């Protein structure tokens, strides 16, 4: 969520996602924090709750581009580690188990096929009554995966000690149960 918040900040400030220089110049103006209220995680960007603005394709694509920037990564790495030190957390992200929290007690590499993820994203848009182009969603997901797997700084990859959970053919309850089983197995050892 922090990378998405940074991406939202960059988009709101007209930053060109293909310009590493613009990203580096702008990123220091983003004050990102996480709060917890009634068991819900709330992402705060410069004093504003931005949870409802983080799940768009534009934000996801900018997050992928800006996350390749070493200055952005350094800025957010400190925030993420501090959050984990002060709280019991469940973090998701494309390099949590390899870079952010390499010593985490439980690591899960949750994945699904690009087609499955595109269908899920399209369903989100449909449920919100928002227009979407399935082929564009799929194309964006494939491009983002490629970009993230091949970036120089902290590429997307499964940590050696992470358990793979492929949710392509699973419903939400099945995914939750699979993750809980991994957690129980790791913690009860």
Predicted regions: what is each one?
Residues 18-20, 35, 88, 147-154:
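Active-site phosphate-binding and catalytic loops of NTP-dependent enzymes
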Residues 47, 76, 90, 141, ...:
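Residue-level signature of catalytic and energy-coupling elements of molecular machines
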Residues 1-56:
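N-terminal phosphate/diphosphate-binding loop that engages ATP/GTP or pyrophosphate donors
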Residues 51-60, 67-128:
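ATP-dependent NMP and nucleoside kinases share a basic, alpha-helical "lid"
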Residues 95-100, 108-119, 128-140, 144-153, ...:
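Anionic, Ser/Thr-rich low-complexity intrinsically disordered regions
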Residues 44-51, 60, 122-128, 146-189:
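NTP-dependent small-molecule kinase module
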Residues 26, 41-42, 46, 91-93, ...:
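Glycine/charge-rich, flexible interdomain linkers and switch-proximal surface loops
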Residues 12-13, 33, 69, 83-86, ...:
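Conserved, well-folded catalytic cores of nucleic-acid-processing
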């Amino acid at each position: 969520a922090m990378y998405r918040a940074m991406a939202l900040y960059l988009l709101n400030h007209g930053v060109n996602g293909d310009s590493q220089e613009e990203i580096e110049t702008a990123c220091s103006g983003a004050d990102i924090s996480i709060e917890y209220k009634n068991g819900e995680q709330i992402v705060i960007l410069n004093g504003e709750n931005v949870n409802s603005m983080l799940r768009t394709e534009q934000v996801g694509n900018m997050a992928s581009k800006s996350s390749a920037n070493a200055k952005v990564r350094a800025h957010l790495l400190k925030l993420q580690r501090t959050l984990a030190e002060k709280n019991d957390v469940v973090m998701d992200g494309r390099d949590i188990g390899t870079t952010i929290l390499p010593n985490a007690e439980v690591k899960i590499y949750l994945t699904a096929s690009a087609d499955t993820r595109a269908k899920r994203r399209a369903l989100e848009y449909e449920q919100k009554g928002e227009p979407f182009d399935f082929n564009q969603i799929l194309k964006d997901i494939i491009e983002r995966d490629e970009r993230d797997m091949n970036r120089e700084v902290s590429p997307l990859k499964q940590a050696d000690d992470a358990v793979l959970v492929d949710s392509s053919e699973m419903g939400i309850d099945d995914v939750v149960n699979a993750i809980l089983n991994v957690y129980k197995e790791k913690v009860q050892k």
